Swiss-Prot record:
Its EC number is 3.1.26.4. Binds 1 Mg(2+) ion per subunit. May bind a second metal ion at a regulatory site, or after substrate binding. CDD domains: RNase_HI_prokaryote_like. It is found in: Cytoplasm. Residues 1-141 form the RNase H type-1 domain. The gene is rnhA. It catalyses: Endonucleolytic cleavage to 5'-phosphomonoester. This is Ribonuclease H. PANTHER family: RIBONUCLEASE H1. Pfam families: RNase_H (PF00075). GO terms for biological process: DNA replication, removal of RNA primer.
Length: 149
């Protein structure tokens, strides 16, 4: 199984509001980047969408080392998600987990892979995280500008 590195970030203006997501995949010197967005979303939805889109770009099962500045995504991937599934997406507060549809899609696209997430501090000089942040903010701004027309 190949080991790939996935960097991801999401951005949301006004939260909720226009948002953007971005990822960078790296494998043996090869790099793939993509980004997108939505007119009305949240920061957590964009953070999670970035990971989903990055996983969808993989052509075969991989060991995925995910680096994200979202503690929400990192904690869910590494520990919360199993409990949510067992409890039919009811959280520890006895309320439905937010973004259920996106988490279900994450489960579907991550199934062939072995994903481990690491949290990295945002805006701390990590080159790939900074690039993802820039790409995601550009998409969020684009969607906000289109909504203003």
């Amino acid at each position: 199984m190949k080991t790939v590195t996935l960097f991801s970030d999401g951005s949301c203006l006004n939260n909720p509001g226009a948002g953007g997501w971005a990822y960078i995949l790296e494998f043996n010197g090869a790099v793939k980047k993509d980004s997108g967005g939505a007119a009305m979303t949240t920061n957590n939805q964009m953070e999670l969408t970035a990971v989903i889109e990055g996983l969808k770009a993989l052509k075969e099962p991989c060991e995925v080392r995910l680096f994200t500045d979202s503690s929400y995504v990192a904690n869910a991937v590494n520990s919360w998600l199993d409990g949510w599934v067992k409890k039919n997406f009811i959280g520890s507060d006895k309320k439905p987990v937010k973004n259920i549809e996106l988490w279900q899609e994450y489960l579907r696209v991550s199934r062939p892979h072995k994903v481990t997430a690491s949290w990295i501090k945002a805006h701390n000089g990590h080159p790939q995280n900074e690039e993802c942040d820039t790409m995601a903010r550009e998409k969020a701004t684009k969607f906000q500008n289109e909504a203003d027309i």
